[in-house]
Amino acid sequence: MSSMTPQEIVSELDRHIVGQNGAKRAVAIALRNRWRRQQVDASLRHEITPKNILMIGPTGVGKTEIARRLARLADAPFIKVEATKFTEVGYVGKDVDSIVRDLVEVAVKQTREADMKKVRVRAEDAAEDRILDVLIPPARGAGVDTARTGEPAGDSTARQVFRKKLREGQLDDKEIEIDLADARPQFEIMSPAGMEEMTEQLRGMFSQMGQERRRARKLKIAEAMKLLVEEEAAKLVNEEEVKTRALANAEQNGIVFIDEIDKVASRQEAGGADVSRQGVQRDLLPLVEGTTVSTKYGMVKTDHILFIASGAFHLAKPSDLIPELQGRFPIRVELTSLSVQDFEAILTQTHASLVKQYQALLETEGVTLDFTPEGITRLAHIAFEVNERTENIGARRLSTVMERLLDEVSYDATRLSGQTVVVDAGYVNARLQSLSQDEDLSRYIL
């Protein structure tokens, strides 16, 4: 898992997310504590449980983006789920245990990919040998030497010449016929909600039936090389060891991000749909507190999985969550609404800002977009004003406004090839001011 310091994590998040320093610090400390726990003596390590985080803030201020960026930094099994997808056991919908099953799937995939990278050099050598065996069939009686030295006796010079050409890509377009494992047919089974695990087991059982079949395929060497490397790497990876390590990784380092947690908060004691909402909260309790979940790879304990929940809490309040669940999220972080200055920073300072994205897109058509500082300031003001007068959707408003602003340029890009379009305050006002001031229009268009 990642050994980045809290300062390094916050610095990396700053490249993509403006403001929200409290939330960044909280997730940075939580991520660093995962690493610290691994350094503690084994006798005490089991007693140290993660401090779960609840992020509270309006939509579009960076809650989900923090989760997305954290997934890349964590170098640990990470899954993001929507609380609204789950229902109480017995109702139509997914049960919360599937969160852990999905996390384990991520861990297995992550571990397998890491192991395949380690054996890639050996797999590439084996794939090269198989291709060379087709191009220069080994002489009879050379089998012993081939197994011992990797080069057929009496044929090493020609083989080395072809190996050099193969590595330099000179033979990529040559077509050869090779034997490849025929992928077992996938049995598609439609499963009722809540029975995904049983369906997966049935699918796995059917796919294992019968022996592995091989068939000859005609392919270009470049494509054959990719397929052979994958096949050889799969042979070198110990699947049982992968599963064992993946289970341990999910248990010790797993991170679950639960978005839209406010949507399962009940505002009052009521029947109907709220029964299912409270049921989801009750089902989440043992998962967050620590329980054992059965997966197809084995049993998984959730005691040391870190849970980060987030919600806008427009209609409900954090206190509307059942008290037991509130207690399972001891760290609470409030994210603030975005100001005009924040909008400007989002447009100019982030690593992959909307300005850079649109410039890169239109550059493919030969159109140069030049945003002046005044144009960006005016754009930020309009996005902020529309948010204030209509629904506040945070930074997502910038995407809507930018799309409307550059609608004509995007449409006529082929005709404008070779030209420079200057986006200044006048350009922005001409295309957006009337819309932003008309509340009825801005409600539907911006």
From Swiss-Prot:
GO term, biological process aspect, one: protein unfolding
Residues given in the record as ATP binding sites: V18, G60, V61, G62, K63, T64, E65, D259, E324, R396
Membership in a protein family: Belongs to the ClpX chaperone family. HslU subfamily.
Gene: hslU
UniProt source species: Acidovorax sp. (strain JS42)
Superkingdom, natural source: Bacteria
Protein name per its UniProtKB record: ATP-dependent protease ATPase subunit HslU
InterPro entries in UniProt: AAA+_ATPase, ATP-dep_Clp_protease_ClpX, ATPase_AAA_core, Clp_ATPase_C, HslU, P-loop_NTPase
Compartment list: Cytoplasm
